[in-house]
């Protein structure tokens, strides 16, 4: 008998992703350090091998390593851009007819293959450039936005009432905060006690368990239409997919289309900033003046992951006195303050304290997705989240590529510049939300917007 709880799959995937990101960043950093300096990277119990005297040759060497690590991360992200965009859009769009499990299964297979390859690379000390090839192949199966988009659409399929949906998403954010916080906290100890190869192997085992749960225990609320599969060729299915995407923006009133476009713009720009700055945090903490080791990096990652937990509490508390749009404002402005403070942080204590200002960072993402789900019909949820995941994939790769490029160009004269730039970019989603408010967004007004039933969009020609 199959069950309809998507939460275990989300939590297992979150554990794997939260552990993979800091591990890979530090693995690349150490490999480039050793290849550039021709000697082994070491770390003490307090700080990494780091020189803070700017006149020292070691300081110049560290800056060179940071530049190379940033540029290599740029190559890796770009390699997965095109296949990730295509696979994400096609898998999530087709999930309205073929079920939500297919995108979850394929993206999990991609994650499994990538982590097994990283395990082999670190164990056999294979050339670092092979990571670019594995990223490209893994992206053909989808990526994290494919998985999250399918999971969110799965929840929307089950929870028809908006209030129940918000509660379930908020509880999920709470659980994600606990899992990612503990994972981030332990990431440094994984590296120190087990090394990179065994850490990646453990991640692969977790992904395999998650894959088994999705395949054999998770039910699918979307029933596959066998008649449509028989009568529609591959080209007709692709044509139908793009036509339904076109109808998503064509259907409805001008107000509905305006709200849809503005909310998507707000979500994508905010995601661009928040996701793009994440890998830079690790490089910023590894270099001077902080010079953190893998354990401190884990502490910082754990504090950052607490934003899931604190965002859940924030949504729960603020929902009693604030509207959705105002809750999103709170998250945007506190994140903006955190970016500005990070740019001027020079001590470990201050860096930990600055993380507090990021505690509501996840709130706008959860609120904006819920607001978007209000303005489309239930039969358009898959197409909507396919568009969102497509844009998030594009924005995620573009942002990490841009931030890595900017950081490598500015680290020598001012490492904190990217954080000031991020604070400035966050003005855009704030202004966009103002426009949403001016158009006339009201809590509950979505019931009028989705009464425009989507017209038939099967491709007959």
Curated annotation (Swiss-Prot):
List all annotated glycosylation positions. Answer: 38, 46, 53
What GO molecular function annotation could you give as one example from this UniProt entry?
transmembrane transporter activity
Q: Which parts form a coiled-coil structure per UniProt?
A: none
Q: Give me the Extracellular side stretches, as residue ranges.
A: 26-70, 125-135, 192-197, 282-301, 346-347, 403-415
What Pfam families does the record tag this protein with? MFS_1 (PF07690)
GO terms classed as biological process: cellular response to 2,3,7,8-tetrachlorodibenzodioxine; vacuolar transmembrane transport
Q: Please list every transmembrane segment annotated in the UniProt record, as residue ranges.
A: 71-91, 104-124, 136-156, 171-191, 198-218, 261-281, 302-322, 325-345, 348-368, 382-402, 416-436
Q: Where in the cell is it found?
A: Lysosome membrane
**Per UniProt, what is the membrane topology?**
Multi-pass membrane protein
- N-terminal signal peptide: 1-25
Which terms in the GO cellular component ontology are assigned? lysosomal membrane
Catalytic activity as recorded in UniProt:
estrone 3-sulfate(out) + n H(+)(out) = estrone 3-sulfate(in) + n H(+)(in); 25-hydroxyvitamin D3 sulfate(out) + n H(+)(out) = 25-hydroxyvitamin D3 sulfate(in) + n H(+)(in); cholate(out) + n H(+)(out) = cholate(in) + n H(+)(in); glycocholate(out) + n H(+)(out) = glycocholate(in) + n H(+)(in)
What are the entry keywords?
Glycoprotein, Lysosome, Membrane, Signal, Symport, Transmembrane, Transmembrane helix, Transport
InterPro entries cross-referenced by the UniProt entry: MFS (IPR011701), MFS_trans_sf (IPR036259)
Topological domain ranges for the Cytoplasmic compartment: 92-103, 157-170, 219-260, 323-324, 369-381, 437-461
Q: Motif Tyrosine-based lysosomal-sorting motif located where?
A: 446-449
What function does this protein fulfil?
A: Lysosomal proton-coupled steroid conjugate and bile acid transporter. Preferentially recognizes lipophilic steroid conjugates or bile acis as endogenous substrates and seems to mediate escape from lysosomes to the cytoplasm. Modulates hepatic cytosolic copper homeostasis, maybe acting as a lysosomal copper transporter and sequestering copper ions in the lysosome. Delivers pathogen-associated molecular patterns to cytosolic pattern recognition receptors as part of the innate immune response to microbes.
Record-stated family:
Belongs to the major facilitator superfamily. SLC46A family.
This protein's name: Lysosomal proton-coupled steroid conjugate and bile acid symporter SLC46A3
What organism, scientifically named, is this protein from?
A: Rattus norvegicus
Q: What is the lineage of its organism?
A: Eukaryota, Metazoa, Chordata, Craniata, Vertebrata
């Amino acid at each position: 008998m199959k069950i309809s709880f998507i939460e275990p799959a989300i939590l297992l995937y979150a554990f794997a992703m939260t552990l993979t990101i800091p591990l890979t960043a530090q693995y690349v950093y150490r490999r480039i350090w050793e290849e550039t300096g021709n000697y082994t990277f070491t770390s003490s119990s307090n700080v990494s091998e780091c020189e803070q005297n700017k006149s020292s040759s070691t300081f110049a060497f560290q800056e060179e390593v940071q530049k190379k690590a940033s540029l290599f991360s740029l190559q890796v992200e770009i390699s997965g851009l095109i296949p990730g965009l295509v696979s994400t859009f096609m898998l999530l769009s087709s999930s309205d007819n073929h079920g939500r499990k297919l995108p979850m299964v394929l993206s999990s297979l991609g994650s499994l293959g990538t982590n097994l390859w990283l395990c082999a690379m670190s164990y056999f000390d294979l050339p670092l450039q092979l990571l670019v090839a594995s990223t490209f192949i893994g992206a053909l199966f989808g990526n994290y936005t494919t998985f999250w988009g399918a999971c969110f659409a799965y929840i929307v399929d089950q929870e028809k009432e908006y209030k129940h949906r918000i509660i379930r998403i908020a509880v999920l954010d709470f659980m994600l905060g606990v899992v990612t916080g503990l994972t981030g906290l332990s990431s440094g100890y994984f590296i120190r006690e087990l090394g990179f190869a065994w850490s990646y192997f453990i991640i692969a085992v977790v992904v395999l368990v998650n894959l088994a749960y999705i395949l054999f225990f998770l039910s699918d609320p979307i029933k596959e239409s066998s008649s449509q599969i028989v009568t529609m060729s591959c080209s007709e299915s692709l044509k139908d997919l793009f036509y339904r995407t076109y109808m998503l923006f064509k259907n409805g009133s001008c107000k509905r289309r305006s709200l849809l476009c503005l909310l998507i713009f707000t979500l994508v720009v905010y995601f661009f900033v928040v996701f793009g700055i994440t890998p830079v945090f690790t490089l910023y903490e590894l270099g001077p003046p902080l010079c953190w080791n893998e354990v401190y990096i884990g502490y910082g990652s754990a504090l950052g992951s607490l934003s899931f937990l604190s965002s859940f509490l924030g949504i729960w508390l603020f929902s009693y006195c604030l509207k959705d749009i105002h809750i999103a404002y709170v998250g945007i402005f506190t994140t903006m303050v955190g970016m500005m403070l990070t740019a001027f942080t020079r001590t470990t204590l201050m860096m930990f304290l600055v993380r507090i200002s990021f505690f509501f960072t996840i709130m706008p993402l959860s609120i904006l997705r819920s607001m978007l789900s209000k303005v489309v019909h239930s039969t358009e949820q898959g197409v909507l989240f396919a568009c969102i995941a497509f844009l998030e994939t594009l924005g995620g790769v573009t942002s990490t590529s841009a931030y890595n490029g900017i950081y490598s160009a500015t680290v020598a004269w001012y490492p904190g510049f990217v954080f000031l730039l991020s604070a400035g970019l966050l003005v855009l989603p704030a202004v966009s939300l103002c426009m949403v408010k001016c158009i006339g967004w009201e809590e509950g007004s979505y019931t009028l917007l989705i009464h425009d039933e989507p017209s038939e969009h099967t491709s007959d020609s």
